[in-house]
Amino acid sequence: MKIAIDAMGGDHAPKAVVLGAMKAIKEYSDLHITLVGKEEEIRQYLTSEERITILHTDEKIESTDEPVRAVRRKKQASMVLAAQQVKDGVADACISAGSTGALMAAGLFVVGRMEGIERPALSPTMPTVDGEGFVMLDVGANVDAKPIHLYQYAVMGSVYAEKVRGIKNPRVGLLNVGTEDGKGNELSKQVFTMLKDAPINFVGNVESRDLLQGVADVVVCDGFTGNVALKSLEGTALALFSMLKEQLMSSFTSKLAAAVLKPKLMVLKDKMDYSEYGGAALFGLKAPVIKAHGSSNDQSIFSAIRQTREMVAKEVIPTISSVMEKEPLQ
């Protein structure tokens, strides 16, 4: 199995990418990795070249670049070359912690869209209080959506949750303003009706306040709603941890309490740590394309590689394609 990685994408590249790649190579004997980027910088952190190849390029896509224009003009950028490796059949999948918009453009224009899928979806795995997490899609690939798009998101998310996350008969929920049937705008109502007849375990409408409780294994929404929900959850979690830290450090007594509670607090922190959940998959493309978090450390990169390997090994893309062929809904 071969995975191409944009070694120059992310806040801590290439160090985090190289260290994460070496960790993955040690863990998985069937894995070969191509690191795409500036060879001189990559070699500063590469202590073992076992099953690791470097594809040198001086060009990269910056966070300030306009995504589509950058992908079309910077043909030798590390992200574009990683995607090209997939298109050419040299790699089975690609990963980048660089610009989300640019990676979506590279996925569409270079890797290509899966036949029958109208719009790709960006899908991270979000944490829950029980540590199991849930898949949410779309969180920003498309801010506007039609009912058919959300129907396809539900099917793709269900296949992923079962194949990669090992959840038998995953629960699929539609993010809405209430749990009752008939709630929401016209889009939500149409999608609800369609999902009731879909080849998935549809559990109905779910509310954002229940997401972290694990009310569903897959949560479906349009990209605008998903992005707002995602950032609200992230912001709330950061604010709560900040307030908790402030209170625990406010007096000598509370500091003693903090020392006693530290092991439990670390468990809680680990449950909410994005670095353990891998990256956000771009569903609807011809091959796995994974967007790692922009601030990924080496553990985050390793988790994204593990996730990508599972997608390839469990044949997620062919399975989605097969299911969609059996359920042509236009």
UniProtKB/Swiss-Prot annotation:
<keyword id="KW-0443">Lipid metabolism</keyword>
<comment type="function">
    <text>Catalyzes the reversible formation of acyl-phosphate (acyl-PO(4)) from acyl-[acyl-carrier-protein] (acyl-ACP). This enzyme utilizes acyl-ACP as fatty acyl donor, but not acyl-CoA.</text>
</comment>
<comment type="pathway">
    <text>Lipid metabolism; phospholipid metabolism.</text>
</comment>
<dbReference type="GO" id="GO:0043811">
    <property type="term" value="F:phosphate:acyl-[acyl carrier protein] acyltransferase activity"/>
</dbReference>
<keyword id="KW-0808">Transferase</keyword>
<keyword id="KW-0963">Cytoplasm</keyword>
<protein>
    <recommendedName>
        <fullName>Phosphate acyltransferase</fullName>
        <ecNumber>2.3.1.274</ecNumber>
    </recommendedName>
</protein>
<keyword id="KW-0594">Phospholipid biosynthesis</keyword>
<dbReference type="GO" id="GO:0008654">
    <property type="term" value="P:phospholipid biosynthetic process"/>
</dbReference>
<dbReference type="GO" id="GO:0006633">
    <property type="term" value="P:fatty acid biosynthetic process"/>
</dbReference>
<keyword id="KW-1208">Phospholipid metabolism</keyword>
<comment type="similarity">
    <text>Belongs to the PlsX family.</text>
</comment>
<dbReference type="InterPro" id="IPR012281">
    <property type="entry name" value="Phospholipid_synth_PlsX-like"/>
</dbReference>
<dbReference type="InterPro" id="IPR003664">
    <property type="entry name" value="FA_synthesis"/>
</dbReference>
<keyword id="KW-0444">Lipid biosynthesis</keyword>
<comment type="subunit">
    <text>Homodimer. Probably interacts with PlsY.</text>
</comment>
<dbReference type="GO" id="GO:0005737">
    <property type="term" value="C:cytoplasm"/>
</dbReference>
<dbReference type="Pfam" id="PF02504">
    <property type="entry name" value="FA_synthesis"/>
</dbReference>
